[in-house]
């Protein structure tokens, strides 16, 4: 029984170590586009075991709100917004069709990891979008 307890503790520590290694990067840091343009925001992640992939939008002075999520390879479209996910290349992106001034905001990508210490949502650094 003691051996099982030690094994479980080691497994828990390994899962936490793996979770702490996730790195989420966004590009570009900022983007200015004309009204009506097609806009692309990019996100890369370092752990292919990630489960859910999110885009959040935060308007100035407001809390971030979940915009869209995806969990399997391919694309998902909602109105003018499309998410593309390719787990093999550790990349997902948000595409905005017919950009509007109301789309101006900070966009944050995030990755959900499941592990021994619970679920973790790890955010990218953000892309500030200005539509002129």
Swiss-Prot record:
One of its GO terms (cellular component) is T cell receptor complex. Keywords: Adaptive immunity, Glycoprotein, Immunity, Immunoglobulin domain, Receptor, Signal, T cell receptor. SMART domains: IG, IGv. Residues 114-117 are annotated as: D segment. Residues 1-20 form the signal peptide. Residues 118-132 are annotated as: J segment. Glycans are attached at residue 42. PROSITE patterns: IG_LIKE. One of its GO terms (biological process) is adaptive immune response. GO terms for molecular function: peptide antigen binding. Residues 21-113 are annotated as: V segment. This is T-cell receptor alpha chain V region 2B4. It comes from Mus musculus (Mouse).
């Amino acid at each position: 029984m003691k051996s099982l307890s030690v094994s479980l503790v080691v497994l828990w520590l390994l899962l936490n170590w793996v979770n702490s290694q996730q790195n989420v990067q966004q590009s570009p840091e900022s983007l200015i586009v004309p009204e009506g343009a097609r806009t692309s925001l990019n996100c890369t992640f370092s752990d292919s075991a990630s489960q859910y992939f999110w885009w959040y939008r935060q308007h100035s002075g407001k809390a971030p709100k979940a915009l869209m999520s995806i969990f399997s390879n391919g694309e998902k479209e909602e109105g003018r917004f499309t998410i593309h996910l390719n787990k093999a290349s550790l990349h997902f992106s948000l595409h905005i069709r017919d950009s509007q001034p109301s789309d101006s905001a900070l966009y944050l990508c995030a990755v959900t990891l499941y592990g021994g210490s619970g679920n973790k949502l790890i955010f990218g650094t953000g892309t500030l979008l200005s539509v002129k």
